[in-house]
């Protein structure tokens, strides 16, 4: 596993009280799943407090960019979102969000550096994954290295929440 130290015992309760800042991270997929994470900053720790995960294959239909943007808006829930950190390859989705008034930053997509940053922030307690984030918690247990590819490459499965978390860690945290 990529994050071999991480298991469900790392899951934290959502902190009680307000957050200092809010951010959303997203890994966009048309056929592959789209994973959105809602992050709140409190006392120097970014908490993934909620998420939205849509798997078009499992649901039997693809969503439009507008439908994904609606899901992001529902996830935001009226909170003052500082910015959205998005999959840099999701040009049409980024444009849809910008037209709706969201401040969107293209994420740093260096996979290995992002994995190292994510692991370090988790170990130092600077990133917390909250108990209600079932898809992220599930993917942490399944995300693994591709032994057949040679070198440091991850398997491109069970990586959608992992990618949005990596984008967040590399670009914001």
Map each language-model feature to its residues:
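Acidic catalytic cores of enzymes that act on phosphate-bearing nucleotides/polynucleotides
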Residues: 18-50
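Short, well-structured alpha-helical interface segments that form or flank functional binding sites
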Residues: 31, 92, 159
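ATPase catalytic-site recognition across NTP-hydrolyzing enzymes
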Residues: 1-28
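Alpha-helical architecture
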Residues: 25, 137, 157-161
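Mg2+-dependent endonuclease catalytic cores in nucleic-acid-processing enzymes, primarily RNase H-like
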Residues: 37-156
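Acidic, Mg2+-coordinating catalytic module of metal-dependent nucleases/exonucleases
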Residues: 155-173
């Amino acid at each position: 596993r990529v994050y071999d130290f991480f298991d469900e015992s790392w899951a934290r309760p959502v902190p009680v009280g307000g957050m200092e800042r809010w951010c959303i991270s997203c890994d966009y997929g048309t056929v592959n799943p789209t994973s959105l994470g809602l992050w709140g900053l409190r006392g120097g720790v970014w908490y993934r407090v909620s998420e939205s995960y849509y798997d078009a294959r499992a649901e039997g239909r693809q969503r439009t960019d507008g439908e994904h943007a609606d899901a992001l808006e529902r996830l935001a829930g009226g909170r003052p979102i500082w910015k959205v950190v998005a999959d840099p390859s999701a040009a049409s989705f980024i444009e849809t969000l910008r037209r709706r008034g969201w401040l969107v930053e293209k994420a740093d997509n260096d996979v290995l550096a992002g994995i190292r940053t994510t692991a370090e922030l988790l170990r130092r307690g600077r990133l917390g994954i909250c108990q209600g984030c079932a898809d992220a918690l599930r993917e942490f247990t399944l995300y693994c290295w591709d032994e057949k590819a040679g070198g440091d490459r991850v398997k491109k499965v069970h990586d959608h929440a992992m990618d949005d978390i990596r984008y967040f860690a590399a670009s914001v945290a």
